[in-house]
Amino acid sequence: MQPNDITFFQRFQNDILAGRKTITIRDASESHFKAGDVLRVGRFEDDGYFCTIEVTGTSTVTLDTLNEKHAQQENMSLDELKRVIAEIYPNQTQFYVIDFKCL
């Protein structure tokens, strides 16, 4: 079995598959992805494969510059997005936005 290239929490799987979640916000450890990359996607909890995505763009963002567009692309409110990012990446302020589409 091939390894997954990127993982998402299981709670995001349905939104990704339905096209409601079209970005992911990551820390520096996952800043190497670039437009055109095709990635196998798995669940964080069990590493089970659930789809393949293509990276369509990348950019940088800080917690303070997250906006309503980011929230819409994550399929959540801006307050919820900021809370989730702060929980996943405590004490960090610089992040990398990975735009993607399911293949």
Swiss-Prot record:
Function: Catalyzes the hydrolysis of N(4)-acetylcytidine (ac4C).
Protein's recorded name: N(4)-acetylcytidine amidohydrolase
InterPro entries to which the protein is assigned, alphabetical: AC4CH (IPR008314), ASCH_domain (IPR007374), PUA-like_sf (IPR015947)
NCBIfam families: PRK04980.1
Protein keywords: Hydrolase
Top-level EC class as recorded in UniProt: hydrolase
The keyword Phosphoprotein appears for this protein: no
Residues at the active site: K21, T24, E74
Gene3D superfamilies: Hypothetical protein
EC numbers on record: 3.5.1.135
Gene: yqfB
Reactions catalysed: N(4)-acetylcytidine + H2O = cytidine + acetate + H(+); N(4)-acetyl-2'-deoxycytidine + H2O = 2'-deoxycytidine + acetate + H(+); N(4)-acetylcytosine + H2O = cytosine + acetate + H(+)
ASCH domain residues: 6-94
SMART domains the UniProt entry points to: ASCH
MF-aspect GO terms: hydrolase activity, acting on carbon-nitrogen (but not peptide) bonds, in linear amidines; N4-acetylcytidine amidohydrolase activity
Pfam families recorded: ASCH
One GO cellular component term noted in the UniProt record for this chain: cytosol
